[in-house]
Amino acid sequence: MRDELNQGLIDYLKASPTPFHATASLAQTLQAAGYKALDEREPWHTEAGGRYYVTRNDSAIIAFQLGGKPLAEHGLRLVGAHTDSPCLRVKPQPELQRQGFWQLGVEVYGGALLAPWFDRDLSLAGRVTYSRDGRIESQLIDFRQPIACIPNLAIHLNREANQGWAINAQNELPPILAQIASQESPDFRALLADQLGREHGLVADVVLDFELSFYDTQPAAVIGLNGDFIAGARLDNLLSCFAGLQALFDAGPDETCVLVCTDHEEVGSASMCGADGPFLEQVLRRLLPEEDDFQRAINRSLLISADNAHAVHPNYADKHDGNHGPKLNAGPVIKVNSNQRYATSSETAGFFRHLCLENEVPVQSFVTRSDMGCGSTIGPITASQLGVRTVDIGLPTFAMHSIRELAGSQDLAHLVKVLGAFYSSAELP
């Protein structure tokens, strides 16, 4: 089972270079498993025992199965994750011609580690909006092949490189696509129109706009002398999206279970498709149109916010609190912060710990050093939006927000097992 899950994650990462592709891949898998697509613009006709999903902006998705028990009396089991990851996104008018090279201007999305983006074989993917026969349409594209790179400056020309070098995102990050003659004027929109034709057989009249991201073409892999690790891009947080989906498929039929994967977590979640927007609440209110039933159900529910945790690094162990150093392959991590950067309470932490113990899943705890700041997740945002009890957890990870992150090869199975047990829990605290 462990190897099968790890390979499934690797395949999902390859199919998901952007939040749009990550959402489309989840939707395709749900559809194949018998889940029915719902349209927010149309009336919904749901029933007990039904399994459904709905997307927003092509970059966020909520999937749910409706159990046979009244929601107002038994609540919902919710798992939350996010589809976005730090990356380099193409600017609206990106064309640059410098020293005989065609480059694209990029904007840094989220808190990316920038140095690892140099000297990588990069491709480009995302969503393109275009007009065709008088209609405005959108399609996802993925060049798949290495079409760009950001070469480093040789150390002979930058002797201080190994003593620390501040990267100027405006000047130093535009990837090189091609070498061009002085009289050439490359047209990026024409390139996108050509890709639409090659990938989808479409003839676009005008490419109107796009949301495109560069990504590393090196595929994820199980690595290490004994296969102890999974290395890959976007483990934060597609690992949790994938684990939540597998757990949803493992859930028993009696409880109402929800998987919510929102966009824009890396930039604050304040959007129509982010956790700080109305997406989840609006979906739940369509399932519970009566206000009293809605309030009762929320107060009987629990959310597991799943987002990667910082594993203690052997070369930088002093960056962790001495008593709270999560280890790879030692199970999911309960994340705690007194200043509510995480939404965990003693009650929700105790429930999750008990769930792990009952299902023989190892569990760990994380709190930041008292002299360091702490990141956050969708947990506090969703808890404050809905008033739902929440526990923040995640799998331990190295190199978070790098172009290539590292997690333990045993931990995915641990997470799927405990999330599946949560979805099937007859009683919540």
UniProtKB/Swiss-Prot annotation:
Entry's EC annotation: 3.4.11.-
Pfam families found in the cross-reference section: Peptidase_M18
Binding site for Zn(2+): 82, 156, 401
Superkingdom of origin organism: Bacteria
Cofactor needs: Zn(2+)
Biological process (GO), any one: proteolysis
Gene Ontology cellular-component annotations: cytoplasm
GO MF: aminopeptidase activity; metallopeptidase activity; zinc ion binding
Record's keyword terms, sorted: Aminopeptidase, Hydrolase, Metal-binding, Metalloprotease, Protease, Zinc
Record PANTHER family: ASPARTYL AMINOPEPTIDASE
Family statement: Belongs to the peptidase M18 family.
Listed name of the protein: Probable M18 family aminopeptidase 2
Organism: Stutzerimonas stutzeri (strain A1501) (Pseudomonas stutzeri)
